[in-house]
């Protein structure tokens, strides 16, 4: 007989007890089982003590699957839920308390905290539809839920009642994806009623962002006057012009004029009426029947019309600032030759986007925004083949990332200045060859037409232009002989120019903008040097005062205002085409260098508008 093999290691041995057939006391049949007595001895390995671990990954799923089978076959269930909801037929659902308690804090409290339901086998449930309860019970066992679109609100409401947060989040995410102008208000109201803050916030943001479309829907006309006033009072309402808000309010009143005409005055005070154009106000005062029958509202709008046409500085509500990304756009420019670049800078994260190029390279152009669209006006194409002054007006749509040509100006204008009043673009001065213009023309986007208006009192190229209180200011420049410190102001109602207090410094090619009811003139060229000095014009006192200088001297710079700060971009310092970007904080009277452009350049057109549609950019980049 062969000896039994011994385990490796000195003195090591293992004994296993075989399965024994025993007859437990009181048992009629033989039962095979292993003895609980273990006399085995295992010698540790040479590597020291080790731990054996094993996990069955799908055990939980399998276990809950078996429990669900037991539920469906009504085995081992220890509770019956008797669900009654309004006029719906009552229904009974058998389940296991431990499973319900594991998925719902409400059921857990019901079955474990000494409540009367803890010892009950039949529990009455009210306030939830049986079909909703059926789905929530099924979710407790399967971690899966499915329903038709029309049932989502009911299931979400039930999940909120029983604090099943995962189902609440899933329903909320689904409803966010379904947001539409026709249902956004209803979803927002529902979310508010059930206390789902995240869904309520997302729905409200959708309403603010798509106000123009939402205001055409039935849900909008069913708002209470308090809800409507709250909505149109939002600073972040996304509208192309304030007339959208005005028309929405008038249409809401007309929906039930007999009951709602008493709310017109409250609504008008929530509309940013000082952002409406005098022409628009005049037309409404003449033609709107609701205003005709309300003398107080009519007088209120007449007062605003007078303030606008008299160009009075007024303490009014701030302009709308929708929570959509607003970027600083730079078009064209010059570095050795004219450029066709269109780029956008995001001050919030410091990134640059390369967008659709201008159709023709240009420098010395100007940029402005009307109705969210970016316009590139005039300039010159300096190229190795020759120089061509431009009369072109091109329009860029951020939503499509495409340029489209508009009607050209009456004459080419290089080193032009532009401003916008009442949605109309004013092209000021500039040059065509050796001709230095004092002419000014106005573009009406809705008609795609240019019309000459009164010429300036002085010929100006490299002129800085700004608009404040519906007045157009032309600052500095070059008249063909002298660089200028003079400035003048255009009154659109009178169609005339008037001289104002001259600057402290001669400046041609300065950057001019408006911030906090003051006009700023930054940098420029005085005939000898590029400048870094900055001065500010107070229209109340009619005086220019110096503020902190820029860190770099620069002329032919780009300038704009973004979120209450001035940004200057590029330019020429007398030796180098600059790529630096500086930012001015009026609260601290300090400049800081915030970023660099992708390359140095001067003579760019700059303006601020909405972030472009990334989908369009990605698609067009893929086709290149």
Curated annotation (Swiss-Prot):
Tell me where in or outside the cell this protein is found: Cytoplasm; Nucleus
Keyword Transmembrane assigned to the entry: answer is no
Domain BACK, chain residue ranges per copy = 184-286
Q: Which spans are transmembrane here?
A: none
The UniProt record lists the N5-[4-(S-L-cysteinyl)-5-methyl-1H-imidazol-2-yl]-L-ornithine (Cys-Arg) (interchain with R-135 in KEAP1) crosslink at: 151
- Name the keywords, alphabetized: Cytoplasm, Kelch repeat, Nucleus, Repeat, S-nitrosylation, Thioether bond, Ubl conjugation, Ubl conjugation pathway
Tell me which residues bear S-nitrosocysteine: 151
Which modifications occur after translation, per UniProt?
A: Non-enzymatic covalent modifications of reactive cysteines by electrophile metabolites inactivate the BCR(KEAP1) complex. Accumulation of fumarate promotes the formation of cysteine S-succination (S-(2-succinyl)cysteine), leading to inactivate the BCR(KEAP1) complex and promote NFE2L2/NRF2 nuclear accumulation and activation. Nitric oxide-dependent 8-Nitro-cGMP formation promotes cysteine guanylation (S-cGMP-cysteine), leading to NFE2L2/NRF2 nuclear accumulation and activation.
Q: Where are the Kelch repeats?
A: 327-372, 373-423, 424-470, 471-517, 519-564, 565-611
Q: Where is this cross-link: N5-[4-(S-L-cysteinyl)-5-methyl-1H-imidazol-2-yl]-L-ornithine (Arg-Cys) (interchain with C-151 in KEAP1)?
A: 135
Q: List every position bearing S-(2-succinyl)cysteine.
A: 38, 151, 241, 288, 319, 613
Recorded hits in Gene3D superfamilies, A to Z, give: 1.25.40.420, Kelch-type beta propeller, Potassium Channel Kv1.1, Chain A
Q: What Pfam families does its record include? A: BACK, BTB, Kelch_1, Kelch_KLHDC2_KLHL20_DRC7
InterPro entries membership: BACK (IPR011705), BTB-kelch_protein (IPR017096), BTB/POZ_dom (IPR000210), KEAP1_BACK (IPR047098), KEAP1_BTB_POZ_dom (IPR030563), Kelch-typ_b-propeller (IPR015915), Kelch_1 (IPR006652), SKP1/BTB/POZ_sf (IPR011333)
Notes on how activity is controlled:
Ubiquitin ligase activity of the BCR(KEAP1) complex is inhibited by oxidative stress and electrophile metabolites such as sulforaphane. Electrophile metabolites react with reactive cysteine residues in KEAP1 and trigger non-enzymatic covalent modifications of these cysteine residues, leading to inactivate the ubiquitin ligase activity of the BCR(KEAP1) complex. Selective autophagy also inactivates the BCR(KEAP1) complex via interaction between KEAP1 and SQSTM1/p62, which sequesters the complex in inclusion bodies and promotes its degradation.
Q: Which positions does the record annotate as the modified residue S-(2,3-dicarboxypropyl)cysteine?
A: 151, 257, 273, 288
For molecular function, the Gene Ontology terms on record are: disordered domain specific binding; identical protein binding; RNA polymerase II-specific DNA-binding transcription factor binding; transcription regulator inhibitor activity; ubiquitin-like ligase-substrate adaptor activity
Tell me the residues on which S-cGMP-cysteine occurs: 434
Please indicate which residues carry the site annotation Sensor for electrophilic agents: 151, 257, 273, 288, 434
Q: Which GO terms describe its cellular component?
A: actin filament; centriolar satellite; Cul3-RING ubiquitin ligase complex; cytoplasm; cytosol; endoplasmic reticulum; inclusion body; midbody
Q: Which GO terms describe its biological process?
A: cellular response to interleukin-4; cellular response to oxidative stress; in utero embryonic development; negative regulation of response to oxidative stress; negative regulation of transcription by RNA polymerase II; proteasome-mediated ubiquitin-dependent protein catabolic process; protein ubiquitination; regulation of autophagy
| Recorded metabolic or biological pathway in which this protein acts | Protein modification; protein ubiquitination
Assembly with partners or alone: Component of the BCR(KEAP1) E3 ubiquitin ligase complex, at least composed of 2 molecules of CUL3, 2 molecules of KEAP1, and RBX1. Interacts with NFE2L2/NRF2; the interaction is direct. Forms a ternary complex with NFE2L2/NRF2 and PGAM5. Interacts with (phosphorylated) SQSTM1/p62; the interaction is direct and inactivates the BCR(KEAP1) complex by sequestering it in inclusion bodies, promoting its degradation. Interacts with NFE2L1. Interacts with BPTF and PTMA. Interacts with MAP1LC3B. Interacts indirectly with ENC1. Interacts with SESN1 and SESN2. Interacts with HSP90AA1 and HSP90AB1.
Q: What free text does the record give on domains? A: The Kelch repeats mediate interaction with NFE2L2/NRF2, BPTF and PGAM5. KEAP1 contains reactive cysteine residues that act as sensors for endogenously produced and exogenously encountered small molecules, which react with sulfhydryl groups and modify the cysteine sensors, leading to impair ability of the BCR(KEAP1) complex to ubiquitinate target proteins.
Q: What is this protein called?
A: Kelch-like ECH-associated protein 1
> From which organism does this entry originate?
Sus scrofa
Gene that this polypeptide is encoded by:
KEAP1
